[in-house]
Amino acid sequence: MQLQSEELLASVLAEIERARATEDRDALAASLFRMATLYRQRGEPTKAITPLKELLALQEETQDHQVMIPTLLLLGDLYRRQGGWHHALALYDRACAMQEAAGDKTAMAATIGSMGVAYEGMEMWEEALTTYRQSLSLKESLGDLVGVALIWNNIGNVEAKRRRFEEALDSYGKSLAIQERAEDRLGQSMTLANLASLHQHRGEWEEATVRYRECLSLMGKEDPQRRAAALNGLGFVRKKTGDLEGAIAAYEEALRLLEASGDHLRSSVVLHNMALIHEERNEWRDALRLMEQVISIDKRIGHPDLKQDMEVFRRIRSKLDAERDAHQ
């Protein structure tokens, strides 16, 4: 699979060079987009930015807004997912102005919603809420029930992060009511997961467990990462209530899903959580085996928690050594 991907990338690079040599703008634009798509499919979104920026520069020469808008939005999404909030906002703002000029309220509502996510990422809560409400107003005027519910969910997230829990619960409740009416199972599962997380942070373990179970019952197999996140949360709650076997079962199911989808970063989080349970049960060797996997992933992906995870490994190792010494 990797070899095929490398061959495709080499082929697209050759196409780009030919298009540049012949000054074929249309072919160059198509090849740059293909390259960006390949990088995204390979799980290398950062590398997709360079060809998209070149593509946007080409499109700017003709000022064709219809072709510029998708590129601006895609670039904005890539920057946003990497924490490049300011870049994302600038790109979204340009796209939104073009959408407004074209009278495309549906697209505007979606873009303004993305701007709210960027403000939320920057912890600019008031700006995030203002932007979400602008998107909400547009979506309500368009009769977009699923979109309205999503924005109420996002507003709930902001309120939860501000520790305004009653306001968060109210927003999540509005989101769920609309999602149930619209039979939006995916949206319901997402809002229920956020509700569960809110109860979890408040130490309301029973409520969190109920919400996680409701969330998982609605989730299909087509979204393994969301399902794994809910299972990881459920595992944490079970651990807090003393159900260590249940916690490990939830973590193991989450780990299977993440490993199957190649999500190494989130796999390391679940492995770490499992290791802590084995440490709590004085199962030092099992804990060390799991922490070795965590550290291996940390090194492979350059994770900033490597030093901290190595300290956990040494702590557990010292407990094993102490147990050995006590039995000698």
Predicted ranges, named:
Residues 21-24, 60-64, 98-104, 138-144, ...:
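Short coil/turn linkers that connect adjacent helices within long alpha-helical scaffolds
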Residues 27-41, 66-81, 106-121, 146-161, ...:
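Conserved alpha-helical positions within TPR/SEL1-like repeat arrays
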Residues 275, 280, 314-328:
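Alpha-helical linker/edge segments of TPR/alpha-solenoid repeat scaffolds
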